[in-house]
Amino acid sequence: MKKTLAFVVIVALSITCALAQSWQKVTPANECTNRHENSLTAIGNKLVLVGGRGVKPVESFDIKTNTWTKHVETPLEMSHFQAINYKGEMWVIGAFTGGYPHEVPIPDVYIFNIEKNEWRKGPSIPEDRRRGAAGAFVYKNKIYIICGETDGHWDGTNAWFDEYDPKTDRWRRLADAPHIRDHVGASVVGDKLYLAGGRRSTAKIQQVLNLTEPAVDVYDFKTGQWSTLSEAQNLPTKRAGASSVVLGKKVLIMGGESDAQEESHANVEAFNTQTMQWEILPMLNKGRHGTGAVNVKGKVYTVAGSGNRGGGPELNSIEVFE
């Protein structure tokens, strides 16, 4: 009986702690550009907003001063990607350019230095591995891209996994993920990569939003092996174009779009890598897809995105989970 009561108390405390955190609207001193199919990363205390449909400026939000600063425009249209911070610079890799439904993979990596306010072209992506709507991340000073699509929203969803070593300027192909998916974000906790969400965009057969992938795939860097979690551990709310971010030992899947509803999803679900279970967190104030999320000193921020499935309305609002 005592053990049962103790368990109930622990669960109650966990729920109370989760509910104590909530999404707050941030009101900046000035506004940024409305955009979607963009990405977001953090450099120091700044949120760096980049890309989207059309050519747009890079913009950074200083958390301390609550102000936006406008930087130079992107060298070309950049959309559908997961920007990363590599040694204090922002890298754009696994992105699209051009219009729907035949967006074209950007063949090169582009790197933005916020201090110099300038772009430079980085390494070329191997020709037969170019795609957009891919996940990207850094692990032990190497850069990775995972899954994506080769022909815009038309066709070519894949499970490719590639590693780039900036030190040696070499690419390496790794084992394909168990499931093909695009419009996916990647998150790493410890030595494991977690993939949740995404879909198989296939406009050539009028199947763009509805072929969502519920399974969670995990890559163990120590063993070099993929695994798929049980069906009971599937993503609770199937969607694509969601943001993926790490908070402690949890992977948060935020927002997204699907054929289930017109409005973008406001759902925030966290996969606890210690209990190996999903937790339901408070919803966003405004559902959104086609953007990113970052963790800055234990607070999760998201900016911009699309308020409905598809291409609009474009947002410029900021929310923080604290």
Across the structure, where does each feature detected by a protein language model lie?
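Bacterial N-terminal signal peptides
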Residues: A6-T16
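Kelch-like beta-propeller repeat domains
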Residues: A20-E322
